[in-house]
């Protein structure tokens, strides 16, 4: 299968790329290669794929990840392709608790709302998953004293969701976090 992924040069995206590239043709769309999710022209590189992993977050245009999802969903709604959004456990946070990364948290909440609105559309055939990791060992939370997931755990969860979709099983929401204690 052909898989398009945003944000594949570091963190979760790099772990996903490393895990899947032996089995799949990867289309890696990353800012280090001149591809930014702020520019919807990258869509032409995504639509030819079978699976889209919507992983990257834009600090300059926080709504970009949701806009990219909306665009791909609109094109793929009646296909048997798969969209995997990398959301965040922060979708559950109370708005007053978003002081550290308010733009990030609000963008992930908006992505979650768009995902949920699309899920309930009865005429869709595209398979959709939203992976919502808790704190993950990435540059974003470097130095924080919190239990963190390894990026490879998230990559394995994404791989599992791809396998399940291929078997006709849709995992619509997959929340994962490090156990405390």
Regions found by a protein language model. Give the residues of each.
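Rossmann-fold scaffold of SDR-type NAD(P)-dependent oxidoreductases
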Residues: 6-7, 49-58, 65, 82-87, ...
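A generic structural motif
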Residues: 22-27, 125-126
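Adenosine-cofactor binding site in Rossmann-like domains, unifying the SAM/SAH pocket
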Residues: 25-44, 58-67
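A short, aliphatic-rich alpha-helical micro-motif
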Residues: 46-47, 104
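Catalytic loop of short-chain dehydrogenase/reductase
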Residues: 58-61, 73-123, 132-135
